[in-house]
């Protein structure tokens, strides 16, 4: 978030967390400071759509780029945003911390029914996406497999946790010729008829809440 504003010569606003408890004040803050781009977790956007805050203020033409990542974005709530701010560009970004930090993107370019899944799109530059089935082979189109990432953005591993590092950062099973690490995300995905990646779920019992990972086993 910081580097993109530096690169484009934009001003970076750190919105006070308390404003997310007051949706109208939050929108007034965006309007007052002439903010034209936001990069939020879907939870924040869902809150505003549920409380119908977008009915109270017209930001169309002012808010021009709306990016979101960290959780699944339901089209039911995204459609509310698109109805109220139709001129904005919407982009769904995906990527775990281990690949610092986004590896796929989807610019919303068509209409979706409320119950349809929103694609996480295609790989970003310098990143390649592998979808591996249960036999560690490339999944066929439409077949569910684990999303794995290779490229220049991979982390070195987990700090002081070599065992977990060895489990998640592994040799690419599709490359028997030389050392090439990939990161196994644990996320299950498939591709649609357009070649776009769709998120299906998790291999384990990890969930996301407000963009933060939670291991249900650790709570138990």
Predicted features by range, described:
Residues 1-2, 25-26, 78-80, 102-106, ...:
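Short aromatic-enriched loop/helix-cap "lid" or pocket-rim segments at secondary-structure transitions
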Residues 1-36:
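Conserved AMP-binding/adenylation subdomain of ANL enzymes
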Residues 3, 7-10, 35-39, 49-119, ...:
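Gly/Ser/Thr-rich phosphate-binding loop
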Residues 16, 41, 69, 104, ...:
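A secondary-structure boundary/capping signal
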Residues 24-27, 55, 220:
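Short hydrophobic/charged patches on amphipathic alpha-helices used for structural packing
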Residues 25, 43, 67, 218:
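Ca2+-coordinating acidic residues in Ca2+-binding motifs
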Residues 43-45, 73, 154:
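Alpha-helix capping/helix-boundary segments
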Residues 89-92, 107-220:
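AMP-dependent adenylate-forming
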């Amino acid at each position: 978030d910081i580097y993109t504003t530096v690169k484009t010569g934009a001003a970076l606003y750190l919105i006070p967390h308390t404003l997310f408890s007051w949706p109208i004040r939050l929108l007034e803050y965006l309007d007052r400071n002439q903010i034209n781009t936001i990069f939020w977790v879907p939870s924040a956007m869902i809150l505003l759509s549920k409380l119908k805050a977008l009915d109270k203020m017209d930001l169309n033409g002012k808010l021009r780029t709306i990016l979101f990542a960290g959780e699944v974005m339901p089209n039911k709530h995204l459609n509310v945003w698109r109805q109220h701010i139709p001129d904005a560009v919407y982009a769904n970004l995906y990527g775990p911390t281990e690949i610092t930090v986004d590896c796929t993107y989807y610019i919303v370019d068509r209409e979706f029914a409320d119950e349809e899944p929103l694609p996480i799109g295609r790989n970003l530059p310098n990143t390649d996406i592998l979808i591996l089935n249960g036999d560690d082979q490339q999944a066929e189109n439409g077949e569910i497999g684990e999303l794995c990432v290779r490229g220049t953005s991979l982390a070195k591993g987990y700090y002081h946790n070599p065992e977990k590092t060895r489990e998640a950062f592994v040799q690419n099973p599709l490359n028997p010729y030389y050392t090439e690490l990939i990161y196994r995300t644990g996320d299950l995905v498939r591709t649609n008829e357009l070649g776009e990646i769709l998120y299906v779920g998790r291999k384990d019992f990890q969930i996301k809440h407000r963009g933060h990972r939670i291991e249900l086993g650790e709570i138990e």
